[in-house]
UniProtKB/Swiss-Prot annotation:
Binds 1 Fe(3+) ion per subunit. This is Probable nitrile hydratase. The modification Cysteine sulfenic acid (-SOH) is found at residue 405. It comes from the Eukaryota. Its cofactor is Fe(3+). The modification Cysteine sulfinic acid (-SO2H) is found at residue 403. It holds the Pfam family NHase_beta_N. Oxidation on Cys-403 is essential for the activity. The keyword RNA-binding does not apply. One of its GO terms (molecular function) is transition metal ion binding.
Amino acid sequence: MHLFTYDLHHDVGGAENMLRLPLDRHERDYLPWERHIHALVVLLVKQGRMSVDELRRGVEGLPSSLAEQASYYEKWGLSVSRILTEKGTVSGHELEQGFLGVPTTDLPQVPRFQVGQRVMVRPFGTTFAYRQPHLRVPGYVHGAVGTIVELPGLFQDPMTGAYGERGTAQPLYRVAFSHRALWPEGAAHAEPGELEDGVVVDVSQPWLEALSEADYAQRLATLHRVAFTPDSNPPQAHKHHHHRHHHDHHHHHHHHHAMHAEHEAHTHDTRYGTEQAAVAKEAALDFPYQPWCEALVQTLTRRGVVRSDELHATLASLDALQNSGAGPQLVARAWSDAAFAEWLLTDAAAAAESLAIRTTNYDADPASAERVGGHRLFSHNHTELRVVANTDTVHNLVCCTLCSCYPTAILGLSPPWYKSKVFRARAVREPRRLLREEFGLVLPEARGIRVHDSTADLRYMVLPQRPQGTEGWSEEHLRTIVTRDSLLGTAVPRVD
Protein backbone atom coordinates (compact mmCIF):
# COMPACT_ATOMS: atom_id res chain seq x y z
CA MET A 1 0.00 0.00 0.00
CA HIS A 2 1.30 3.46 -0.93
CA LEU A 3 0.18 6.26 1.36
CA PHE A 4 1.89 8.95 -0.72
CA THR A 5 2.94 9.69 -4.26
CA TYR A 6 6.57 10.26 -5.14
CA ASP A 7 6.91 13.00 -7.72
CA LEU A 8 10.08 12.42 -9.75
CA HIS A 9 10.40 15.80 -11.45
CA HIS A 10 13.88 16.26 -9.95
CA ASP A 11 15.15 12.78 -10.85
CA VAL A 12 16.26 13.14 -14.48
CA GLY A 13 19.13 10.68 -14.81
CA GLY A 14 18.86 8.95 -18.20
CA ALA A 15 15.58 10.66 -19.12
CA GLU A 16 14.72 9.40 -22.60
CA ASN A 17 13.56 12.62 -24.19
CA MET A 18 16.56 14.52 -22.82
CA LEU A 19 18.86 12.47 -25.03
CA ARG A 20 17.71 14.36 -28.12
CA LEU A 21 18.18 17.80 -26.63
CA PRO A 22 21.34 19.90 -27.05
CA LEU A 23 23.15 21.19 -23.98
CA ASP A 24 23.13 24.95 -23.55
CA ARG A 25 26.72 25.65 -22.49
CA HIS A 26 26.26 29.39 -22.34
CA GLU A 27 28.34 30.70 -19.45
CA ARG A 28 26.84 33.57 -17.51
CA ASP A 29 27.38 35.25 -14.19
CA TYR A 30 24.66 34.48 -11.71
CA LEU A 31 22.33 37.38 -11.07
CA PRO A 32 22.52 39.14 -7.69
CA TRP A 33 19.30 37.56 -6.44
CA GLU A 34 20.55 34.06 -7.36
CA ARG A 35 23.80 34.64 -5.47
CA HIS A 36 21.84 35.95 -2.49
CA ILE A 37 19.69 32.81 -2.39
CA HIS A 38 22.78 30.59 -2.52
CA ALA A 39 24.44 32.60 0.25
CA LEU A 40 21.23 32.52 2.29
CA VAL A 41 21.12 28.72 2.15
CA VAL A 42 24.79 28.43 3.15
CA LEU A 43 24.17 30.77 6.07
CA LEU A 44 20.99 29.04 7.26
CA VAL A 45 22.74 25.66 7.17
CA LYS A 46 25.71 27.00 9.13
CA GLN A 47 23.33 28.47 11.71
CA GLY A 48 21.60 25.11 12.09
CA ARG A 49 18.24 26.55 11.00
CA MET A 50 17.90 23.99 8.23
CA SER A 51 19.86 21.17 6.65
CA VAL A 52 20.83 20.40 3.08
CA ASP A 53 18.55 17.37 3.20
CA GLU A 54 15.64 19.59 4.20
CA LEU A 55 16.44 21.91 1.31
CA ARG A 56 16.40 18.96 -1.08
CA ARG A 57 13.17 17.64 0.37
CA GLY A 58 11.56 21.04 -0.10
CA VAL A 59 12.63 21.16 -3.75
CA GLU A 60 11.50 17.60 -4.40
CA GLY A 61 8.16 18.35 -2.74
CA LEU A 62 7.30 21.12 -5.17
CA PRO A 63 4.44 20.11 -7.46
CA SER A 64 5.52 19.30 -11.00
CA SER A 65 3.55 22.19 -12.45
CA LEU A 66 5.55 24.63 -10.34
CA ALA A 67 8.88 22.84 -10.75
CA GLU A 68 8.50 23.12 -14.52
CA GLN A 69 8.20 26.90 -14.22
CA ALA A 70 10.85 27.61 -11.59
CA SER A 71 14.57 27.95 -12.23
CA TYR A 72 17.21 26.28 -10.08
CA TYR A 73 17.55 29.06 -7.52
CA GLU A 74 13.84 29.85 -7.58
CA LYS A 75 13.27 26.28 -6.40
CA TRP A 76 15.77 26.89 -3.62
CA GLY A 77 13.90 30.03 -2.56
CA LEU A 78 10.54 28.26 -2.55
CA SER A 79 12.02 25.34 -0.63
CA VAL A 80 13.53 27.64 2.02
CA SER A 81 10.14 29.36 2.35
CA ARG A 82 8.42 26.06 2.99
CA ILE A 83 11.02 24.73 5.42
CA LEU A 84 11.24 27.89 7.52
CA THR A 85 7.46 28.25 7.78
CA GLU A 86 7.19 24.60 8.82
CA LYS A 87 9.72 25.23 11.57
CA GLY A 88 8.05 28.45 12.70
CA THR A 89 11.18 30.49 11.98
CA VAL A 90 9.00 32.87 10.01
CA SER A 91 5.28 32.76 9.28
CA GLY A 92 3.77 32.42 5.87
CA HIS A 93 1.83 35.59 6.61
CA GLU A 94 5.09 37.50 7.05
CA LEU A 95 6.52 36.12 3.81
CA GLU A 96 3.38 36.94 1.87
CA GLN A 97 3.23 40.45 3.32
CA GLY A 98 6.89 40.93 2.48
CA PHE A 99 6.25 39.83 -1.09
CA LEU A 100 3.36 42.25 -1.44
CA GLY A 101 5.45 45.10 -0.06
CA VAL A 102 2.98 45.51 2.79
CA PRO A 103 4.16 46.23 6.36
CA THR A 104 3.49 43.17 8.50
CA THR A 105 0.72 43.95 10.95
CA ASP A 106 -1.77 42.13 13.11
CA LEU A 107 -4.18 45.07 12.96
CA PRO A 108 -7.57 44.28 11.43
CA GLN A 109 -8.12 45.50 7.90
CA VAL A 110 -10.58 48.35 7.38
CA PRO A 111 -13.66 47.36 5.35
CA ARG A 112 -13.43 48.79 1.83
CA PHE A 113 -16.80 47.74 0.45
CA GLN A 114 -20.39 48.64 1.30
CA VAL A 115 -23.70 46.82 1.10
CA GLY A 116 -25.07 47.16 -2.41
CA GLN A 117 -21.65 47.58 -4.02
CA ARG A 118 -20.83 45.65 -7.19
CA VAL A 119 -17.73 43.46 -6.96
CA MET A 120 -15.80 40.79 -8.83
CA VAL A 121 -14.15 37.79 -7.19
CA ARG A 122 -10.51 37.67 -8.16
CA PRO A 123 -9.64 34.81 -10.53
CA PHE A 124 -7.55 32.05 -9.02
CA GLY A 125 -5.05 31.66 -11.83
CA THR A 126 -1.68 32.93 -10.62
CA THR A 127 1.15 31.11 -8.98
CA PHE A 128 2.84 30.84 -5.65
CA ALA A 129 3.03 27.41 -4.13
CA TYR A 130 5.68 27.16 -1.47
CA ARG A 131 2.91 25.58 0.57
CA GLN A 132 -0.54 24.25 -0.23
CA PRO A 133 -3.19 26.93 0.22
CA HIS A 134 -6.27 26.57 2.38
CA LEU A 135 -8.97 28.28 0.37
CA ARG A 136 -12.46 29.12 1.63
CA VAL A 137 -13.77 30.73 -1.56
CA PRO A 138 -15.39 28.06 -3.75
CA GLY A 139 -14.03 27.71 -7.23
CA TYR A 140 -17.33 28.29 -9.00
CA VAL A 141 -17.31 31.99 -8.04
CA HIS A 142 -13.72 32.73 -9.10
CA GLY A 143 -13.92 35.50 -11.70
CA ALA A 144 -17.66 36.01 -11.17
CA VAL A 145 -19.40 39.35 -10.56
CA GLY A 146 -21.92 39.92 -7.79
CA THR A 147 -23.37 42.32 -5.24
CA ILE A 148 -22.52 42.70 -1.55
CA VAL A 149 -25.59 42.10 0.61
CA GLU A 150 -24.07 42.04 4.11
CA LEU A 151 -20.90 42.67 6.12
CA PRO A 152 -21.16 40.22 9.06
CA GLY A 153 -17.89 41.38 10.65
CA LEU A 154 -14.13 40.81 10.67
CA PHE A 155 -12.76 37.27 10.93
CA GLN A 156 -9.31 35.73 11.13
CA ASP A 157 -7.67 34.87 7.81
CA PRO A 158 -8.31 31.14 7.22
CA MET A 159 -5.19 30.85 5.05
CA THR A 160 -2.88 31.69 7.94
CA GLY A 161 -5.10 30.04 10.54
CA ALA A 162 -4.79 26.72 8.73
CA TYR A 163 -1.07 26.80 9.51
CA GLY A 164 -1.47 27.87 13.13
CA GLU A 165 -0.42 31.43 12.36
CA ARG A 166 -2.12 34.60 13.48
CA GLY A 167 -2.64 36.73 10.44
CA THR A 168 -4.63 39.87 9.78
CA ALA A 169 -8.34 39.88 10.55
CA GLN A 170 -10.23 40.41 7.30
CA PRO A 171 -13.70 41.81 6.62
CA LEU A 172 -16.06 39.05 5.51
CA TYR A 173 -18.85 39.84 3.07
CA ARG A 174 -21.92 37.98 1.88
CA VAL A 175 -21.96 38.35 -1.89
CA ALA A 176 -24.99 37.54 -4.04
CA PHE A 177 -24.49 36.03 -7.51
CA SER A 178 -27.08 35.22 -10.15
CA HIS A 179 -26.94 31.87 -11.90
CA ARG A 180 -26.49 33.81 -15.12
CA ALA A 181 -23.28 35.34 -13.72
CA LEU A 182 -21.97 32.03 -12.43
CA TRP A 183 -22.81 29.68 -15.30
CA PRO A 184 -23.36 31.68 -18.49
CA GLU A 185 -22.48 28.64 -20.58
CA GLY A 186 -25.64 26.96 -19.26
CA ALA A 187 -28.00 29.72 -20.36
CA ALA A 188 -29.31 27.74 -23.32
CA HIS A 189 -30.41 24.90 -21.05
CA ALA A 190 -31.80 26.99 -18.18
CA GLU A 191 -35.34 26.43 -16.99
CA PRO A 192 -37.72 29.42 -16.92
CA GLY A 193 -36.61 31.91 -14.28
CA GLU A 194 -33.49 29.96 -13.40
CA LEU A 195 -31.05 32.54 -14.77
CA GLU A 196 -32.16 35.00 -12.12
CA ASP A 197 -32.02 32.47 -9.30
CA GLY A 198 -29.08 33.13 -7.08
CA VAL A 199 -26.46 32.00 -4.60
CA VAL A 200 -25.05 33.97 -1.66
CA VAL A 201 -21.42 33.16 -0.82
CA ASP A 202 -19.18 34.27 2.06
CA VAL A 203 -16.10 35.98 0.59
CA SER A 204 -13.29 37.71 2.49
CA GLN A 205 -12.04 41.13 1.42
CA PRO A 206 -8.72 40.14 -0.23
CA TRP A 207 -10.64 38.21 -2.87
CA LEU A 208 -12.80 41.14 -4.01
CA GLU A 209 -12.36 43.93 -6.54
CA ALA A 210 -14.73 46.90 -6.75
CA LEU A 211 -16.71 47.37 -9.97
CA SER A 212 -18.59 50.39 -11.23
CA GLU A 213 -22.18 49.90 -12.31
CA ALA A 214 -21.06 50.27 -15.93
CA ASP A 215 -18.33 47.64 -15.57
CA TYR A 216 -20.73 45.31 -13.79
CA ALA A 217 -23.31 45.64 -16.57
CA GLN A 218 -20.70 45.15 -19.28
CA ARG A 219 -19.32 42.03 -17.64
CA LEU A 220 -22.79 40.55 -17.31
CA ALA A 221 -23.47 41.31 -20.97
CA THR A 222 -20.24 39.73 -22.21
CA LEU A 223 -19.85 36.89 -19.75
CA HIS A 224 -17.88 33.91 -20.87
CA ARG A 225 -15.99 32.40 -18.00
CA VAL A 226 -14.78 28.96 -17.03
CA ALA A 227 -15.00 28.50 -13.31
CA PHE A 228 -12.27 26.66 -11.45
CA THR A 229 -13.74 23.54 -9.89
CA PRO A 230 -12.01 20.81 -7.89
CA ASP A 231 -11.72 18.56 -10.94
CA SER A 232 -10.43 21.17 -13.37
CA ASN A 233 -7.39 23.36 -13.82
CA PRO A 234 -7.43 27.00 -12.70
CA PRO A 235 -8.42 29.46 -15.42
CA GLN A 236 -5.46 30.80 -17.33
CA ALA A 237 -7.07 33.88 -18.86
CA HIS A 238 -6.04 36.11 -15.97
CA LYS A 239 -2.33 35.46 -15.86
CA HIS A 240 -0.63 38.06 -13.68
CA HIS A 241 3.03 38.98 -13.74
CA HIS A 242 4.83 38.45 -10.48
CA HIS A 243 5.82 41.96 -9.56
CA ARG A 244 6.20 43.54 -6.16
CA HIS A 245 3.19 45.59 -5.12
CA HIS A 246 4.10 48.94 -3.64
CA HIS A 247 0.77 50.63 -4.20
CA ASP A 248 -2.06 51.15 -1.72
CA HIS A 249 -1.46 48.59 0.98
CA HIS A 250 -5.19 48.16 1.49
CA HIS A 251 -5.19 46.44 -1.91
CA HIS A 252 -4.68 43.16 -0.14
CA HIS A 253 -4.69 40.37 -2.67
CA HIS A 254 -2.33 37.78 -1.36
CA HIS A 255 -5.02 35.14 -1.72
CA HIS A 256 -5.16 35.40 -5.47
CA HIS A 257 -1.39 35.40 -5.55
CA ALA A 258 -1.53 32.49 -3.16
CA MET A 259 -0.33 29.26 -4.51
CA HIS A 260 -2.46 27.51 -7.05
CA ALA A 261 -0.05 24.99 -8.43
CA GLU A 262 -0.73 22.34 -5.82
CA HIS A 263 -4.39 22.39 -6.81
CA GLU A 264 -3.65 21.79 -10.45
CA ALA A 265 -4.65 18.50 -11.97
CA HIS A 266 -1.53 16.65 -12.93
CA THR A 267 -1.25 14.38 -15.91
CA HIS A 268 1.33 11.63 -15.78
CA ASP A 269 1.14 10.06 -19.22
CA THR A 270 4.90 9.53 -19.07
CA ARG A 271 7.45 10.24 -16.40
CA TYR A 272 9.15 12.89 -18.49
CA GLY A 273 6.22 14.11 -20.53
CA THR A 274 6.83 17.82 -19.89
CA GLU A 275 10.61 17.92 -19.57
CA GLN A 276 11.24 19.55 -22.94
CA ALA A 277 9.18 22.57 -21.95
CA ALA A 278 11.05 22.77 -18.66
CA VAL A 279 14.40 22.71 -20.46
CA ALA A 280 13.30 25.51 -22.78
CA LYS A 281 12.31 27.54 -19.74
CA GLU A 282 15.76 27.01 -18.20
CA ALA A 283 17.40 28.49 -21.28
CA ALA A 284 15.02 31.45 -21.54
CA LEU A 285 16.18 33.08 -18.29
CA ASP A 286 12.54 33.61 -17.36
CA PHE A 287 12.32 34.02 -13.60
CA PRO A 288 8.66 34.28 -12.49
CA TYR A 289 9.57 33.66 -8.85
CA GLN A 290 12.49 36.08 -8.64
CA PRO A 291 10.39 38.72 -6.80
CA TRP A 292 9.41 36.12 -4.21
CA CYS A 293 13.05 35.13 -3.70
CA GLU A 294 14.11 38.76 -3.32
CA ALA A 295 11.31 39.37 -0.82
CA LEU A 296 12.30 36.23 1.09
CA VAL A 297 15.84 37.50 1.65
CA GLN A 298 14.57 40.95 2.64
CA THR A 299 11.99 39.55 5.05
CA LEU A 300 14.46 37.23 6.77
CA THR A 301 16.95 40.08 7.07
CA ARG A 302 14.32 42.45 8.46
CA ARG A 303 13.21 39.80 10.94
CA GLY A 304 16.78 39.24 12.12
CA VAL A 305 16.84 35.60 11.05
CA VAL A 306 20.00 36.51 9.16
CA ARG A 307 21.99 39.73 9.33
CA SER A 308 23.02 41.76 6.32
CA ASP A 309 26.68 41.68 7.31
CA GLU A 310 26.56 37.87 7.62
CA LEU A 311 24.95 37.57 4.22
CA HIS A 312 27.51 39.81 2.56
CA ALA A 313 30.36 37.97 4.27
CA THR A 314 29.00 34.69 2.91
CA LEU A 315 28.77 36.19 -0.57
CA ALA A 316 32.38 37.33 -0.27
CA SER A 317 33.48 33.84 0.77
CA LEU A 318 31.68 32.30 -2.22
CA ASP A 319 33.42 34.78 -4.51
CA ALA A 320 36.73 33.87 -2.91
CA LEU A 321 36.12 30.17 -3.58
CA GLN A 322 35.36 30.96 -7.20
CA ASN A 323 38.75 32.62 -7.58
CA SER A 324 40.83 30.60 -5.13
CA GLY A 325 42.52 28.33 -7.66
CA ALA A 326 42.37 25.51 -5.10
CA GLY A 327 41.60 22.82 -7.68
CA PRO A 328 44.49 23.68 -10.01
CA GLN A 329 46.78 23.96 -6.98
CA LEU A 330 45.94 20.42 -5.85
CA VAL A 331 46.41 19.02 -9.35
CA ALA A 332 49.72 20.80 -9.94
CA ARG A 333 51.10 19.48 -6.64
CA ALA A 334 49.90 15.95 -7.45
CA TRP A 335 51.57 16.09 -10.87
CA SER A 336 54.80 17.25 -9.27
CA ASP A 337 54.80 14.94 -6.23
CA ALA A 338 53.83 11.27 -6.61
CA ALA A 339 53.51 10.79 -2.84
CA PHE A 340 51.11 13.73 -2.61
CA ALA A 341 49.11 12.34 -5.54
CA GLU A 342 48.66 9.05 -3.71
CA TRP A 343 47.66 10.91 -0.54
CA LEU A 344 45.16 13.03 -2.48
CA LEU A 345 43.53 9.92 -3.94
CA THR A 346 43.25 8.17 -0.57
CA ASP A 347 42.42 11.10 1.75
CA ALA A 348 41.70 14.24 -0.19
CA ALA A 349 40.67 16.27 2.86
CA ALA A 350 43.93 15.63 4.72
CA ALA A 351 46.09 16.15 1.65
CA ALA A 352 44.35 19.42 0.84
CA GLU A 353 44.57 20.59 4.44
CA SER A 354 48.36 20.30 4.22
CA LEU A 355 48.11 23.10 1.64
CA ALA A 356 45.66 25.08 3.83
CA ILE A 357 42.75 24.14 1.55
CA ARG A 358 39.43 23.15 3.12
CA THR A 359 37.44 20.65 1.10
CA THR A 360 34.12 20.54 2.96
CA ASN A 361 31.30 22.90 2.07
CA TYR A 362 30.42 23.58 5.68
CA ASP A 363 32.16 23.91 9.02
CA ALA A 364 32.17 20.29 10.10
CA ASP A 365 35.61 19.11 11.25
CA PRO A 366 36.50 15.74 9.69
CA ALA A 367 39.37 15.27 12.14
CA SER A 368 36.91 15.16 15.04
CA ALA A 369 34.57 12.65 13.42
CA GLU A 370 33.42 9.79 15.60
CA ARG A 371 34.18 6.26 14.52
CA VAL A 372 31.78 3.35 14.21
CA GLY A 373 33.34 -0.01 13.42
CA GLY A 374 36.48 1.74 12.27
CA HIS A 375 34.58 4.07 9.94
CA ARG A 376 34.18 7.80 10.39
CA LEU A 377 30.77 9.08 11.45
CA PHE A 378 30.45 12.58 10.04
CA SER A 379 28.24 15.31 11.42
CA HIS A 380 25.13 16.44 9.58
CA ASN A 381 25.78 18.60 6.50
CA HIS A 382 29.42 17.50 6.22
CA THR A 383 30.56 16.76 2.68
CA GLU A 384 33.56 14.63 1.83
CA LEU A 385 35.75 15.28 -1.22
CA ARG A 386 36.86 12.32 -3.31
CA VAL A 387 39.49 12.74 -6.02
CA VAL A 388 39.37 10.26 -8.91
CA ALA A 389 42.27 9.90 -11.35
CA ASN A 390 42.10 9.69 -15.12
CA THR A 391 44.32 6.99 -16.60
CA ASP A 392 45.08 5.51 -20.00
CA THR A 393 42.15 3.14 -19.53
CA VAL A 394 39.59 5.19 -17.54
CA HIS A 395 38.22 8.71 -17.97
CA ASN A 396 36.12 10.13 -15.13
CA LEU A 397 33.08 12.41 -15.41
CA VAL A 398 31.30 14.14 -12.51
CA CYS A 399 27.58 14.95 -12.33
CA CYS A 400 24.58 14.89 -9.99
CA THR A 401 21.31 13.64 -11.46
CA LEU A 402 19.08 14.48 -8.48
CA CYS A 403 20.02 18.14 -8.04
CA SER A 404 23.51 19.45 -8.81
CA CYS A 405 25.84 18.56 -5.94
CA TYR A 406 29.24 20.03 -6.73
CA PRO A 407 32.66 20.53 -5.07
CA THR A 408 31.86 24.15 -4.23
CA ALA A 409 34.58 24.35 -1.59
CA ILE A 410 37.17 23.70 -4.31
CA LEU A 411 35.62 25.19 -7.44
CA GLY A 412 33.10 27.79 -6.25
CA LEU A 413 29.60 27.92 -7.74
CA SER A 414 28.83 25.42 -10.46
CA PRO A 415 28.15 26.66 -14.01
CA PRO A 416 24.52 26.81 -15.18
CA TRP A 417 25.01 23.94 -17.65
CA TYR A 418 26.09 21.64 -14.79
CA LYS A 419 22.74 22.33 -13.07
CA SER A 420 20.75 21.83 -16.27
CA LYS A 421 18.44 18.87 -16.73
CA VAL A 422 20.01 18.03 -20.08
CA PHE A 423 23.50 17.58 -18.63
CA ARG A 424 22.21 15.64 -15.63
CA ALA A 425 20.17 13.32 -17.86
CA ARG A 426 22.72 12.69 -20.58
CA ALA A 427 25.84 12.39 -18.41
CA VAL A 428 24.83 9.02 -16.97
CA ARG A 429 23.09 7.65 -20.06
CA GLU A 430 25.32 8.68 -22.96
CA PRO A 431 28.52 10.19 -21.53
CA ARG A 432 30.68 9.49 -24.56
CA ARG A 433 28.28 11.16 -26.97
CA LEU A 434 27.75 14.06 -24.55
CA LEU A 435 31.48 14.72 -24.28
CA ARG A 436 31.95 14.49 -28.03
CA GLU A 437 28.93 16.50 -29.18
CA GLU A 438 28.75 19.15 -26.49
CA PHE A 439 32.33 19.55 -25.25
CA GLY A 440 34.35 18.48 -28.28
CA LEU A 441 36.16 15.84 -26.24
CA VAL A 442 36.73 12.69 -28.27
CA LEU A 443 38.07 9.79 -26.23
CA PRO A 444 39.71 6.63 -27.58
CA GLU A 445 37.24 3.78 -27.92
CA ALA A 446 39.40 1.62 -25.69
CA ARG A 447 39.23 4.15 -22.84
CA GLY A 448 36.27 3.53 -20.58
CA ILE A 449 34.22 6.27 -18.99
CA ARG A 450 33.29 6.15 -15.33
CA VAL A 451 30.55 8.58 -14.31
CA HIS A 452 30.38 9.63 -10.66
CA ASP A 453 26.81 10.57 -9.73
CA SER A 454 27.17 12.75 -6.64
CA THR A 455 23.75 12.11 -5.14
CA ALA A 456 24.57 12.21 -1.42
CA ASP A 457 27.39 13.69 0.67
CA LEU A 458 30.44 12.84 -1.41
CA ARG A 459 31.81 15.47 -3.77
CA TYR A 460 34.06 14.50 -6.66
CA MET A 461 36.98 16.14 -8.42
CA VAL A 462 38.88 14.64 -11.33
CA LEU A 463 42.67 14.40 -11.26
CA PRO A 464 43.47 14.77 -14.98
CA GLN A 465 46.42 13.10 -16.65
CA ARG A 466 49.44 15.33 -16.97
CA PRO A 467 49.86 16.17 -20.67
CA GLN A 468 53.07 15.52 -22.52
CA GLY A 469 55.30 18.52 -23.06
CA THR A 470 55.02 19.80 -19.48
CA GLU A 471 58.17 18.14 -18.19
CA GLY A 472 60.19 20.55 -16.08
CA TRP A 473 57.30 22.97 -15.58
CA SER A 474 56.91 24.62 -12.19
CA GLU A 475 53.74 24.09 -10.17
CA GLU A 476 52.75 27.69 -10.91
CA HIS A 477 53.08 27.02 -14.64
CA LEU A 478 51.18 23.73 -14.40
CA ARG A 479 48.24 25.43 -12.71
CA THR A 480 47.63 27.55 -15.79
CA ILE A 481 46.52 24.58 -17.90
CA VAL A 482 44.17 23.08 -15.30
CA THR A 483 40.64 24.30 -16.05
CA ARG A 484 37.41 23.90 -14.14
CA ASP A 485 36.06 21.65 -16.89
CA SER A 486 39.10 19.37 -16.69
CA LEU A 487 38.39 18.94 -12.96
CA LEU A 488 34.85 17.82 -13.81
CA GLY A 489 35.89 15.52 -16.65
CA THR A 490 34.31 17.48 -19.49
CA ALA A 491 37.75 18.50 -20.79
CA VAL A 492 41.41 17.52 -20.50
CA PRO A 493 44.40 19.84 -19.96
CA ARG A 494 46.10 20.83 -23.17
CA VAL A 495 49.41 22.43 -24.04
CA ASP A 496 49.04 25.05 -26.77
